[in-house]
């Protein structure tokens, strides 16, 4: 159980909630270019388990690494940090 605290935790935006109990989250990170020093934005999509289907498209959520739940799903929804504003 000591590994539990060392699991990766990411904050990202939900881009899809069309699957049952699954959301797709885009996590954006910035890295410094090695030669020129400019900050470059990288993004990566993760599928996360949403047991109660509470996250909606546009929400900012926090996800945590977990055991493999399917072939592509290795993260679990921890909390909805900020709900999307519907206009």
From Swiss-Prot:
Q: Could you tell me one molecular function GO term of this UniProt entry?
A: rRNA binding
Keywords of the record, alphabetical order, are: Ribonucleoprotein, Ribosomal protein, RNA-binding, rRNA-binding
CDD domains membership:
Ribosomal_uS17
Give Gene Ontology CC terms: cytosolic small ribosomal subunit
Cited PROSITE patterns: RIBOSOMAL_S17 (PS00056)
Name the Pfam families on file.
Answer: Ribosomal_S17
Function noted in UniProt: One of the primary rRNA binding proteins, it binds specifically to the 5'-end of 16S ribosomal RNA.
NCBIfam families given for it? PRK05610.1 (NF004123), uS17_bact (TIGR03635)
The subunit field of the Swiss-Prot or TrEMBL record says: Part of the 30S ribosomal subunit.
- Family assignment from sequence similarity: Belongs to the universal ribosomal protein uS17 family.
Q: What is this protein called?
A: Small ribosomal subunit protein uS17
**Gene this chain is encoded by:** rpsQ
